[in-house]
Amino acid sequence: MIVTTTAHIEGREIASYLDIVSAESVHGINVVRDLFAGMRDFFGGRSQTLERALKEARIQATNEIKERARQCNADAVVGVDFEISMPAGRGGMVVVFATGTAVRLK
């Protein structure tokens, strides 16, 4: 399954646009457990805890849009867009939304 952020796939022609596919992935970040590591990461300029949660959420959302595209008998998903949200008051949660268009290729 080809998944791309571009509207086209080089060297391939889109035969039909099947459906919009989307997925959400929510991951919790254990802020208390990672407090000291988080402080070190923060002062170093990066939070490995947050980066790890974002990466896992993005991978999960990508896998879900692939599965939804397979259910449409698609060959690829084009125009994939990721949005990231960290809901206020939710105690260290990361939400990744993935959206794209399932297509059949010639």
Curated annotation (Swiss-Prot):
Pfam families: YbjQ_1. It comes from the Bacteria. SUPFAM superfamilies: YbjQ-like. Belongs to the UPF0145 family. This is UPF0145 protein PFL_3418. The lineage of its organism: Bacteria, Pseudomonadati, Pseudomonadota, Gammaproteobacteria, Pseudomonadales.
